[in-house]
């Protein structure tokens, strides 16, 4: 049986108070096993990045628990616990240009975490760590003296990956790491992430809006709509047997690399008003082994009938 590294239980994240309160994430429940890539997919504003930022501690939570390696990590933490979590949980940001300090050299950008947490014995060891990781991401040691603006988007994202991985984390949150990149370099970055996962045993939370991309890298996928996770399943199970109407709509929008089939494809439009949750309240239900869907009892009966 796989060992859980991250567990999200009844998570709620809100902003503002009183009449201005906005609930961005509601009743989120999922877990991520050690060594797997778990993808969180949804359109812009769905709350997927909000969850990722809450796990790393950049967003506060209103309710529920975030469990990492058996310990609750949301809420108050000691300085020692916070420092340990920063080392063990790293984030690769969406926009490599905005997430890198333009006034710092690549050497300093990658070394900043090492300096803050004293993860080296002497200057020689620090240089060795930085040079090793910059080579691992496909750049050269001579690039360390340059500044971020001297690199392409793909190269800047490689620097962001190096900055995260030099800390030797256990868990990496990749927040749409290829959406700001040119199509020609997206596959290179995805292959790089897969390479590091295989070599270092990393666990990923991969946040994206494109289902065709996450199919390539994911073990399991969660689909989120307006702060509610509506479906969770293994990758091929989700693609072959999408149950929730929103998941079906997302999948229908994935391009097919065959012009004849693409012309015949019927796009589905998700209508949230089709759900009647006034009296029959929904919950996350396991409809098939390892396949969960957000549904009430009436919907569950209908979904199960459609599977038979």
UniProtKB/Swiss-Prot annotation:
Binding annotation for ATP: 42-49
GO BP terms in the entry: peptide transport; protein transport; transmembrane transport
Gene name on record?
amiF
For this UniProt entry, what is the primary localization, expressed as one broad class?
Answer: membrane
GO MF annotations, alphabetized: ATP binding; ATP hydrolysis activity
Q: Which GO terms describe its cellular component?
A: plasma membrane
Give the species this sequence originates from: Streptococcus pneumoniae serotype 4 (strain ATCC BAA-334 / TIGR4)
Pfam short name (any one): oligo_HPY
- Protein family membership: Belongs to the ABC transporter superfamily.
Per UniProt, subcellular location reads as: Cell membrane
Name of the protein in its database record: Oligopeptide transport ATP-binding protein AmiF
Spell out the CDD domains in the cross-references.
ABC_NikE_OppD_transporters (cd03257)
Question: Which function does this protein serve?
Answer: Part of the binding-protein-dependent transport system for oligopeptides. Probably responsible for energy coupling to the transport system.
Topology relative to the membrane: Peripheral membrane protein
Keywords from UniProt, A to Z, are:
ATP-binding, Cell membrane, Membrane, Nucleotide-binding, Peptide transport, Protein transport, Transport
Q: Which residues cross the membrane?
A: none
Location of the ABC transporter domain: 6-251
| Residue ranges that the Swiss-Prot or TrEMBL entry lists as coiled coil | none
